From Swiss-Prot:
SMART domains: UBQ
Residue ranges of the TM segments: none
Coiled-coil ranges from the UniProt annotation: none
Subcellular localization, as worded in the UniProt entry: Cytoplasm; Nucleus
Entry function: Ubiquitin exists either covalently attached to another protein, or free (unanchored). When covalently bound, it is conjugated to target proteins via an isopeptide bond either as a monomer (monoubiquitin), a polymer linked via different Lys residues of the ubiquitin (polyubiquitin chains) or a linear polymer linked via the initiator Met of the ubiquitin (linear polyubiquitin chains). Polyubiquitin chains, when attached to a target protein, have different functions depending on the Lys residue of the ubiquitin that is linked: Lys-48-linked is involved in protein degradation via the proteasome.
PANTHER family: UBIQUITIN (PTHR10666)
Keyword Nucleus: yes
Name under which the protein is recorded: Ubiquitin
Domain of life: Eukaryota
Ubl conjugation keyword on record: yes
């Protein structure tokens, strides 16, 4: 199924995923497309931050759902 990931810059990334995919898997796919390391990614759906070990099905994320990607930047100001 396809889902969409919207970044803070307003860009929308389309991903091909399965309901059984873990959030880790989704972050790896985002890394493949965008080059953003998974440890800097925070995914939000329906106002909730998604935990790495859970699956898309756990959060009732269905086809054509839109997730929001927030970057967690490391250290320094």
């Amino acid at each position: 199924m396809q889902i969409f990931v919207k970044t803070l810059t307003g860009k929308t990334i389309t991903l091909e995923v399965e309901s059984s995919d873990t959030i880790d898997n989704v972050k790896a796919k985002i890394q493949d497309k965008e080059g953003i390391p998974p440890d800097q990614q925070r995914l939000i759906f329906a106002g909730k931050q998604l935990e790495d070990g859970r699956t898309l099905a756990d959060y009732n994320i269905q086809k054509e759902s839109t997730l929001h990607l927030v970057l967690r930047l490391r250290g320094g100001f």
